UniProtKB/Swiss-Prot annotation:
One of its GO terms (biological process) is translation. The keyword Metal-binding does not apply. Keywords: Ribonucleoprotein, Ribosomal protein. PROSITE patterns: RIBOSOMAL_L30. Belongs to the universal ribosomal protein uL30 family. GO terms for molecular function: structural constituent of ribosome. The keyword Hydrolase does not apply. This is Large ribosomal subunit protein uL30. The gene is rpmD. It comes from the Bacteria. Part of the 50S ribosomal subunit. The lineage of its organism: Bacteria, Bacillati, Bacillota, Bacilli, Lactobacillales. It holds the Pfam family Ribosomal_L30. One of its GO terms (cellular component) is cytosolic large ribosomal subunit.
Amino acid sequence: MAQIKITLTKSPIGRKPEQRKTVVALGLGKLNSSVIKEDNAAIRGMVTAISHLVTVEDVK
């Protein structure tokens, strides 16, 4: 299955609690931290909810 790399590029400080929880649930902590996750509907939905805070790249 395909994988995606998610990088936290903006701070969740001052954002809604749901958005902050989504950042933590994805395993992102500090700015510029990255995680590699499976590309599925659940992860894509989480990324869409915080798309203004993260960047997404395909991993080959």
